[in-house]
Amino acid sequence: MTKLTDEVKKRRTFAIISHPDAGKTTITEQMLLFGGVIRSAGTVKARKSGHYATSDWMAIEKKRGISVTSSVMQFEYQGKRINILDTPGHQDFSEDTYRTLMAVDAAVMVIDSAKGIEPQTKKLFKVVKKRGIPIFTFMNKLDRDGREPLDLIAELEDLLGIEGVAMNWPIGMGKQLKGLYDIANNRVELYRKDDDDRYLPLDKNGKLAEDEPLAQDSLYQSTLDDIDLLKEAGNTFDKEKILKGDQTPVFFGSALTNFGVETFLDSFVNLAPAPQEHIVNGDEKLAADDPEFSGFVFKIQANMNPNHRDRIAFVRIGSGEFKKGIDVTLARTGKPVRLNNATEFMSSERVQVSDAVAGDIVGLYDTGNFQIGDSIYAGKKKIVYPALPQFTPEIFMRVTAKNVMKQKSFHKGMNQLVQEGAIQLYRGYSTDDYILGAVGQLQFEVFSFRMKNEYNSEVELHTLGNRVARWINPDQLDPKMSSSRNLLVKDRDGEPLFLFENAFAERWFKDKYPDVELTSRL
């Protein structure tokens, strides 16, 4: 085994997905605690105290208590190198989340045990399932009264079509929570006990010693009944199915009280896969431990350091080893680029990195070379990773600078924020209008907030409302086709498209111009 292969096998790169408020950021914090990265976990609820979650680093995230960008955090744990991508739960930021899911080898799905599977979780699950990567489930908020565990397991199959296999089982919940029956490790983990007293061994029949006080508790007896039912009618643990994404190991716990999180993390590190091969150049397989360095840009973030007004391109290394000063080729342009400055992350904090391997996420200081979806490679052979998803916006607004004397900062801010990919920029086809398009309303609020706070440029947004965006072949375009109901604009690449007032306006256009072909993005 080569040193590179050995290093790659230590990597565990995963994203955490959930519906807003299911506790995703809190469980991330607890993992960082176990990784020795932070001394205390700050939950979103603590925002009045000025104590914020490590992964919520942007000013607007701290102000509103929601994650709106994907954070990257890295730490060592049990001889493994952990790379966590904490994705935004808010549905308006699904673009950032979808792209992030292209850069991971596994996903952790956090579910509120009182609510079960919620719409955003379902949406994100579909993307992960499509990729065929393993999914690990953490049923959170066991410190509150919630739904029956058997119902939660059944819901995984009913709503998501994936087998759930219980790795542990609650002994009570809410105020009556006593502990977890740890099926995988044949022990009971007691709630609110210190390390030495936390675990009670089970005998070969899966039962506590009779002199244990908990053994006489009716909640424990009820749990044993559930365990018997699981053995008879539940799914059998199958690692092969897990790695294919056909079965999900299910762990119960409470991220807020840090209960069951360590057990979950230990199991995850052992079960989750190391970086896998990628399909490149259309249909070629590229091994993660291939000696030639390559990777792809899945995210661009401006102003991670507000003092320097910088831009960072986040790169998932797909193969080989990164070394400081390495010369690579940018596949899109064929131009050589020397990678002198690379960084690793703890949210907005960063550390200079001199080497990294497949599976790692590195940040490259970007002076405008990179775009989301770019492939880079160090060898002579061109390597191009699959295109990342791009979404058709649904809401559009005209944007102007409030202060006409600040056009320079207005243009700089707008261009940098657009390059991050959460909001898209269009120009009037025969006017100088700037039009922004986004998947949801919150993206405009974030844009406006960041323009003011990061670029000192207040903007005015004039709504065009919900529009149906459809691209048109330039050869078929006649500017006279445009009207107030189907606004003609061009995208960042200069490609023409119509913004239809509604589906009816689109149908009317198609009836009038039956030979014109209109296309949409994702």
Swiss-Prot record:
Pfam families: EF-G_D2, GTP_EFTU, RF3_C. It is found in: Cytoplasm. GO terms for molecular function: GTP binding; GTPase activity; translation release factor activity, codon nonspecific; translation release factor activity, codon specific. GO terms for cellular component: cytosol. The keyword Membrane does not apply. CDD domains: RF3 (cd04169), RF3_III (cd16259). Keywords: Cytoplasm, GTP-binding, Nucleotide-binding, Protein biosynthesis. GO terms for biological process: regulation of translational termination. GTP binds at residues 18-25, 86-90, 140-143. Transmembrane segments: none annotated. Its main location: cytoplasm. Residues 9-276 form the tr-type G domain. InterPro entries: EF-G-like_DII (IPR053905), EFG_III/V (IPR035647), G_TR_CS (IPR031157), P-loop_NTPase (IPR027417), PrfC (IPR004548), RF3_C (IPR032090), RF3_dom_3_sf (IPR038467), RF3_GTP-bd (IPR041732). Belongs to the TRAFAC class translation factor GTPase superfamily. Classic translation factor GTPase family. PrfC subfamily. Increases the formation of ribosomal termination complexes and stimulates activities of RF-1 and RF-2. It binds guanine nucleotides and has strong preference for UGA stop codons. It may interact directly with the ribosome. The stimulation of RF-1 and RF-2 is significantly reduced by GTP and GDP, but not by GMP. This is Peptide chain release factor 3.
